[in-house]
Each structure stands twice: as structure tokens, then as C-alpha cells.
Amino acid sequence: MMKPFFKTKLFGFAMSVLVLSCLVFGSGAKAWASPGGSNQLGFSAEVEGMDDLNTPGATGTMFYGGGVSIQYWISPGFGVRLGADYFNNSKSTGPLPQNILPFYSGLMVNLLSGSLGSLDLVGDFGQVLNNGVDNTYFDAGLQLNTLLSDRRQFFLDVRFREDGVGTMATPWEFVTAGLGISFF
């Protein structure tokens, strides 16, 4: 007989696979190889991993989580976005907070675009909650997009993040990598 814990985990996994399958294989109206388009609204969701770069005593500390953003492409080469991420610490003790929750707004610039995908430069500023304590936030990175299906894109992004810019003597620095899906 299965224990309730395993039933819950199995049910959660099955529902995740079902939802992702519907998102990926559902039908849309148009295909976009690049997210850039005039007056184009989009939504994205991703899973992310984050590694600390500069905090003494935090060697081997990884954060994991995900995020969502709403983006609006003003022209084919320039867009703005609003987003929020959530990261949970892999260790229960150490100098870094147990959870990090950045809220940000930023710019997206399309660097390269082709029939199969595009490369965007992204940069964001905002506020972050570290265990509920407010601080400043900055990130910059690259996002590689490829066509997934009609009006959907798969993307990989890599970002450099700073937590505590201008408020801490040495801001926490992280590098993150994420995989996600954008809808237009």
C-alpha cells in the first residue's frame, strides 16, 4: 500500500506533466520565431537555479525556484517587462537568507533574430525581500529564445544578479540559469 506522501508527490507530478503538455502542445493562432513585434504582449514562466558568487561561508549554497513576467514589445527590437521570482535556499543554515523574492521591472533589447529564434539582452531593477526584509535589486543577462509551437517559445536565460546594491557594503552576487516558456 502506498503512503499518503508518495500519493501526493505522484499526483503533483502527474498534474505538472498534464499542465505542461497542454501548454506546449495546445494550438495557437500564429508562430513567432522572435518575441520582438510591435505592440505585442507576452507572458512567461520559468524554473531557475541560482549560485552565490561572493559571500564568505556560503560555498556550495544553491538556490532554486522560479518566476513569472509580463512583457510588452514596443517595437521588434525593444520591450519592457515586469516580473517576480522566488528562490529557496538549499541549506538551512549559513550567511544567506532562506528565501529571496525579487520584484523587478526592466528592459529587453533584441540583439539577433532569425527564423528559428532570437537572442535578447535583459536588464532589471527593483526591490527584493530577503526573509521578508526589503532591499535593492539589479540583474542583467542574456535570453536565448527558440520557437516551441504556435505563439509559444522555449527560452534559456543566464543572468548576473546583485542583491543589496547601494545598501550593503558588499552586495550579494549571484549567477542564475533558467528554462521557461513564453506565450504571445
Per-region residue spans from a language model:
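Cleavable N-terminal export/targeting peptides
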Residues: 1-38, 184
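Generic detector of low-complexity/intrinsically disordered segments
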Residues: 12, 17-27, 55, 64, ...
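Short glycine/proline- and aromatic-enriched beta-strand/turn motifs that initiate or cap beta-hairpins
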Residues: 26-74, 80, 86, 174-184
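Transmembrane beta-barrel outer-membrane domains
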Residues: 36-38, 57-63, 96-102, 131-137, ...
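Ser/Thr- (and often Asn-) enriched beta-sheet segments in non-cytosolic proteins
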Residues: 42-44, 136, 160
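Generic short beta-strand segments
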Residues: 47-51, 85-88, 126, 159-161
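Gram-negative (and chloroplast) outer-membrane scaffold detector with strong preference
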Residues: 67-154, 182-184
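Low-complexity, intrinsically disordered Gly/Pro/Thr-rich segments
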Residues: 155-166
